[in-house]
């Protein structure tokens, strides 16, 4: 079959998509980029070691089979990490198995501005950040055609910078000749000051106005700096009028940034404003599991659940706690457990700040204990693997909280208070004769006491 590797791969994707889950396809398969055909080997690039390992172990046979269906030829496949590509792949584009010289311009300066770990592939999507992620991806796919400017805001450590870098990586991946500049507002200000001091205003303006994409992190810090705001106002106008993409991040929406000039505030609101909220329990667990996978750490599920229930508002602190526990385990030569996690994190999680047991907390702990989602408790599912843990959770809510029966029922998908009574009585009676249930309830109660 005489076709470009990218054309072949596009057809393969249609086959592979039908044989994988949506999550697997979006997470692993879509991260692959075909680069060439060398003899009987189809060369594919992937973003990192983790992706390479997963694809090699789980999806090689499926990819080979899809290639054979599309081309009627049997190819081997080879995965290469994009950041470690041999030099020839940066200058060669193989078509119909013939090497044809091409010219791919990759700016080392632009790439150096971006953290290689901050990509869309490594970003964990949850309800708290889904909108901001979708907006960022739309901008990365079609710069200056989707939302301009894109303004992302949220608290410290929630993923704003990750999305900013991911946008930059994605744009450069799709168009290596694109001029992308990522900078913090502090650096922008310092460069402006130096340009004034050294009489290099022309060079400064050229750097920031003759580009295709400008990403400025923590834009709120230009507020109150008159000269910086003046310069950025004209930079913004120059880029916007030239149909260039602008992406800004802040810890608050434009209308809440004090001492920000109204003319800038209005421009920041021209495009799309997307917020990132603190992650919910499921997202916190997903973040920890992804971190453990990337770092190749073997962390018990209950330990990650402990971290996720204790640290709620900051992803960096969440990941930092995981690494702290691993380091503590290594230094003390103890196995990783919930008890070890409590000891390792006692300095950053005050025992005096133990929070009140709530219905939400009980749902989080019990659902995790039984490898379910909180949404399962609120669903209409009645299979034993869901119904029985739901009854245990209702029992604990009745026993450990002051909530009324109707309120408990409401929090479990709008169930009637009689359902809660039935669950409480059933678990109470079974506890008298079922030793394994007694152990489970005691374990759950202990975990809740440790919150």
UniProtKB/Swiss-Prot annotation:
<dbReference type="GO" id="GO:0006275">
    <property type="term" value="P:regulation of DNA replication"/>
</dbReference>
<keyword id="KW-0446">Lipid-binding</keyword>
<feature type="binding site">
    <location>
        <position position="157"/>
    </location>
    <ligand>
        <name>ATP</name>
    </ligand>
</feature>
<dbReference type="Pfam" id="PF11638">
    <property type="entry name" value="DnaA_N"/>
</dbReference>
<dbReference type="GO" id="GO:0008289">
    <property type="term" value="F:lipid binding"/>
</dbReference>
<dbReference type="InterPro" id="IPR001957">
    <property type="entry name" value="Chromosome_initiator_DnaA"/>
</dbReference>
<comment type="similarity">
    <text>Belongs to the DnaA family.</text>
</comment>
<dbReference type="InterPro" id="IPR013317">
    <property type="entry name" value="DnaA_dom"/>
</dbReference>
<feature type="region of interest" description="Domain IV, binds dsDNA">
    <location>
        <begin position="330"/>
        <end position="451"/>
    </location>
</feature>
<dbReference type="InterPro" id="IPR020591">
    <property type="entry name" value="Chromosome_initiator_DnaA-like"/>
</dbReference>
<keyword id="KW-0547">Nucleotide-binding</keyword>
<keyword id="KW-0235">DNA replication</keyword>
<protein>
    <recommendedName>
        <fullName>Chromosomal replication initiator protein DnaA</fullName>
    </recommendedName>
</protein>
<dbReference type="InterPro" id="IPR024633">
    <property type="entry name" value="DnaA_N_dom"/>
</dbReference>
<dbReference type="InterPro" id="IPR010921">
    <property type="entry name" value="Trp_repressor/repl_initiator"/>
</dbReference>
<dbReference type="InterPro" id="IPR027417">
    <property type="entry name" value="P-loop_NTPase"/>
</dbReference>
<dbReference type="GO" id="GO:0005524">
    <property type="term" value="F:ATP binding"/>
</dbReference>
<comment type="subunit">
    <text>Oligomerizes as a right-handed, spiral filament on DNA at oriC.</text>
</comment>
<dbReference type="GO" id="GO:0005737">
    <property type="term" value="C:cytoplasm"/>
</dbReference>
<dbReference type="Pfam" id="PF08299">
    <property type="entry name" value="Bac_DnaA_C"/>
</dbReference>
<feature type="binding site">
    <location>
        <position position="160"/>
    </location>
    <ligand>
        <name>ATP</name>
    </ligand>
</feature>
<dbReference type="GO" id="GO:0003688">
    <property type="term" value="F:DNA replication origin binding"/>
</dbReference>
<keyword id="KW-0067">ATP-binding</keyword>
<keyword id="KW-0238">DNA-binding</keyword>
<dbReference type="Pfam" id="PF00308">
    <property type="entry name" value="Bac_DnaA"/>
</dbReference>
<feature type="region of interest" description="Domain I, interacts with DnaA modulators">
    <location>
        <begin position="1"/>
        <end position="73"/>
    </location>
</feature>
<keyword id="KW-0963">Cytoplasm</keyword>
<feature type="binding site">
    <location>
        <position position="161"/>
    </location>
    <ligand>
        <name>ATP</name>
    </ligand>
</feature>
<dbReference type="GO" id="GO:0006270">
    <property type="term" value="P:DNA replication initiation"/>
</dbReference>
<dbReference type="InterPro" id="IPR013159">
    <property type="entry name" value="DnaA_C"/>
</dbReference>
<feature type="binding site">
    <location>
        <position position="159"/>
    </location>
    <ligand>
        <name>ATP</name>
    </ligand>
</feature>
<dbReference type="InterPro" id="IPR038454">
    <property type="entry name" value="DnaA_N_sf"/>
</dbReference>
<dbReference type="GO" id="GO:0016887">
    <property type="term" value="F:ATP hydrolysis activity"/>
</dbReference>
<dbReference type="InterPro" id="IPR003593">
    <property type="entry name" value="AAA+_ATPase"/>
</dbReference>
<feature type="region of interest" description="Domain II">
    <location>
        <begin position="73"/>
        <end position="112"/>
    </location>
</feature>
<comment type="function">
    <text>Plays an essential role in the initiation and regulation of chromosomal replication. ATP-DnaA binds to the origin of replication (oriC) to initiate formation of the DNA replication initiation complex once per cell cycle. Binds the DnaA box (a 9 base pair repeat at the origin) and separates the double-stranded (ds)DNA. Forms a right-handed helical filament on oriC DNA; dsDNA binds to the exterior of the filament while single-stranded (ss)DNA is stabiized in the filament's interior.</text>
</comment>
<dbReference type="InterPro" id="IPR018312">
    <property type="entry name" value="Chromosome_initiator_DnaA_CS"/>
</dbReference>
<dbReference type="GO" id="GO:0005886">
    <property type="term" value="C:plasma membrane"/>
</dbReference>
<feature type="region of interest" description="Domain III, AAA+ region">
    <location>
        <begin position="113"/>
        <end position="329"/>
    </location>
</feature>
């Amino acid at each position: 079959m005489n076709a470009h590797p990218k054309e072949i791969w596009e057809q393969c994707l249609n086959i592979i998509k039908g044989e994988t889950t949506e999550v697997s396809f979006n997470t692993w398969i879509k991260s692959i980029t075909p680069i060439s055909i060398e003899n009987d080997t189809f060369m594919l690039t992937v973003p990192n070691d983790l992706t390479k390992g997963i694809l090699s172990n789980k999806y090689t046979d499926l990819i080979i089979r899809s290639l054979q269906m599309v081309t009627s030829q049997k190819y081997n496949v080879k995965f290469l990490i994009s950041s470690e590509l041999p030099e020839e792949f940066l200058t060669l584009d193989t078509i119909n198995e013939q090497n044809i010289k091409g010219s791919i311009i990759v700016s080392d300066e632009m790439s150096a501005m971006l953290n290689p770990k901050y990509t869309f592939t490594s970003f964990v999507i949850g309800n708290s950040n889904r909108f901001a992620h979708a907006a960022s991806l739309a901008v990365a796919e079609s710069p200056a055609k989707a939302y301009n400017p894109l303004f992302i805001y949220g608290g410290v450590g929630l993923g704003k910078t990750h999305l900013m870098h991911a946008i930059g990586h994605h744009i450069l991946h799709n168009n290596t000749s694109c001029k992308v500049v990522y900078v913090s507002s502090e650096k922008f200000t310092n460069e402006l000051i130096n340009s004034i001091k050294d009489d290099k205003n022309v060079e400064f303006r050229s750097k920031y106005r003759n580009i295709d994409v400008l990403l400025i992190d923590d834009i709120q810090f230009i507020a109150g700096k008159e000269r910086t705001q003046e310069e950025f106002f004209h930079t913004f106008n120059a880029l916007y009028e030239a149909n260039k993409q602008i992406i800004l991040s802040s810890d608050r929406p434009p209308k809440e940034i004090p001492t920000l000039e109204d003319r800038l505030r209005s421009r920041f609101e021209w495009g799309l404003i997307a917020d990132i909220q603190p992650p919910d329990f499921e997202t916190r667990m997903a973040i920890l599991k992804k971190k453990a996978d990337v770092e190749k750490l073997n962390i018990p599920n209950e330990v990650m659940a402990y971290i996720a229930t204790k640290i709620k508002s900051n992803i960096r602190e969440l990941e930092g706690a995981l690494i702290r526990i691993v380091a503590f385990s290594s230094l003390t030569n103890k196995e990783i457990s919930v008890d070890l996690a409590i000891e390792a994190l006692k300095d950053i999680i005050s025992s005096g700040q133990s929070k009140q047991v709530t219905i939400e907390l009980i749902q989080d702990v019990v659902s995790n204990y039984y490898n379910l989602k909180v949404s399962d408790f609120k669903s209409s599912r009645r299979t034993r693997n869901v119904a029985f843990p739901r009854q245990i959770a209702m029992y604990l809510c009745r026993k450990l909280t002051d909530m009324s029966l109707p309120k408990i029922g409401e929090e479990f998908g709008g169930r009637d208070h009689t359902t809660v009574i039935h669950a409480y009585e059933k678990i109470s009676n079974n506890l008298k004769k079922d030793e394994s249930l007694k152990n489970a309830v005691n374990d759950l109660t202990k975990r809740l006491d440790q919150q």
